[in-house]
């Protein structure tokens, strides 16, 4: 697996044709996607997010095929197409299957593209070109979240009896992934000499909104963003250390009164948890065990090529009375795409991790690796597209010294 990853990475470093032609519309769509998702509940039946998502996948495919890649990469694409065809033959819900296939394809294409230094440079150039628009998106989103929080709009009762914040999004986790993406954009704005006061204020609102969601999986990506933000706010180490201690002190006080603390309290005291592991994972270990056992008993075709992603929802509904996915990318791939798909996904991830440690300093590479692995293993990475976009942009930002700018 490691040798395959190195071969893929080496091949993708030697792209003959120019890359990054689609970087500008990709960045524009990602920034717009933040606003349309934040306003999702106010848009009614208008499928703007599906339109943007479809356009983004088309751009990613165009960008991928416009580069002359290795035969190994082309073989990987062929495997994905064949696995998708097999999945559609055994699916039980076309809409759910298409949704997961699009999310997975988008994620794997982005991971494949971002391993190219030229594409990372193109993404950075696009960020710089649309910097004013990105600034407007960040400030508008922060003010909108502040308005919702101040008026108590967008709170729902979930996971017990405590209220959790989801704004106008469909779930709390969706909002938390948006907040992570907004923090990444703030890092970019601060690194390009944006107003520290303005974006510190925005980041405080966004972090508080994340805490109110109760989505524990996003604590680690948000914490990583916070560390990188502090790293870029001040030049002297003592000021960075002092600010970090100050943030931790006040952060603890805010955390203890937030929805996140309620979620930890509910999970640790859940009377339905039959073990410590079940309490810590909030029952995810039972989902994983159910799905892995079902995969192991699915016959040779199911073991090798999967049983479709849509069937995992029905499986968990029958076994656990919950219509949910596996809450783990590897288990999801194992059941949906079988061993073949799991190996393909792992090869893609190994290629990415090799690229991270080859292009960044060790500390940054470790942080970005944890940024992916923590949600990937404990809840899911590819189902949360805003989190995927956040990683792609963060990797591009960390790969370059940015040009100072004077506007907000």
Language model: regions and residue ranges:
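Transmembrane alpha-helices of multi-pass inner-membrane enzymes
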Residues: 57-58, 184, 365-375, 381-408
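A juxtamembrane structural motif centered on a specific transmembrane helix
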Residues: 1-24, 65-68, 193-196, 359-360, ...
